[in-house]
Structures are given as structure tokens and as C-alpha cells.
């Protein structure tokens, strides 16, 4: 089903990451999970709806000189395969922390999700979910951190999935993003907007701690999920049972359930 696209005052689309001719909030509605996945500018994504019902997704996106910011709402639980463009960092802030799985692990409370560009990652999110995202050029973030005197371990950050952060600083950044991405918001000074967001983000990174735990089983789970999808699509005219899938995949019911 086609997406419904709207801009406050114009219908001009974005041509390339972080290089739009307008600095206005772009809002898109979709009624199919995979259609919704393709609405985020210049990301490589695919979504699988994992709960029954009629899907509704909303994306509000703002392009700034060196930064992309967005709010994403999804009505049903989905599994997301995501990859942002190279030489960037993505930071994700679920509105309600503790409900998100990234690469198979529960993010937990008071956290910031992190992944570098050109690196595929997986999110599993529940129904009625809201997440705010920031994508920023790596060199711009490094330069801003140097100018502000922030002490950030970049090697750790590049391999991180989850950061434990100060709740007050996290709430401040969430509120700033919400204000900037409101339907009626007009960005009259994109450089100022970007600087405000950078300051709030650096305050979060400067006081945060990278969670060093990494899910070693993520790649295996990816392979099992991919094979299960292939089997289901190959037998679209019949409903495969869980025991049949387990037999074909050579895994236990418990292992299969964990993967999903």
C-alpha cells in the first residue's frame, strides 16, 4: 500500500543524506511494515511484522546540515534489519526504554542505542512503539567533541550497541527531539538546531558508559531466521507448523522461539 507523504507547506523531497534543499519536517504514513521501512531517507532496511493486525507506521524526519533526525511510530511489533550509510553514527532513543532488543539483547532502562554506519543491525520492537533517531557524520561528531572537550572512547563507541546514560540528560535530548520533530515545527535556523542537538548528545555520550556485553549468537540467529523466512515463503500455499520448521532447520522449539 502506498505511503502518505506530507510536508508543512511544500512537497519537495530529499535528494541525498544530509543534503536537502529544505530544512522542514517531512512526515510519512504507511500501512505496510516493509513499505514503512523504505520511508527513512537513505537507510537500507527491511521490516517483518511479527504480531497480527493492521499495521500503521509514521515517520517524521528532519534533515540538518550534518545530521538526520527522526521520530518513528509503529503500531505493531516488528523485526527490523537496518543499515545506515557509511562514515556515520546512529543513536536511538526509545521513548519507553527497556522494551527494545538490539542484535538479540534487551537494551534495558536508561539506555542509548548505538551503531556505526555501514554495519547491519537488528531491532525487535513491541507494539505501540516510538523511537527517536539521530544520524550524524562521524567527522562532524568528532570535531564537535574535540571543541567541547568531551572525553569519548571512539574505539569503544564504534563497537557499541548499548550505552547506559544519565536519565536526566536522556530526557533532555528526548524532549529536544520531540520539540524539533513536532508536526507544526518549522526549522528557521538549521545550524542552531544542529548545535543544540549536538550539545545534548555530547552531554549524554560524555557521561555514559558503553555496555561491553555483545550477543555472540546474533549471527547464528540471523541465519536461522533467514532460513525460516525462506521456508515459509517457499510454502506460501500451506501453513507450516512449528514442529515442521524445527525439523527443517535442525533446531529445537525453544531455540526457534528464542530466535524470534
Q: Where on the chain are the PLM-derived regions?
A:
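Conserved hydrophobic/aromatic beta-strand scaffold that supports enzyme active sites
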Residues: 61, 69-71, 90-91, 112-114, ...
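Short hydrophobic/aromatic patch on the recognition helix
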Residues: 256-260
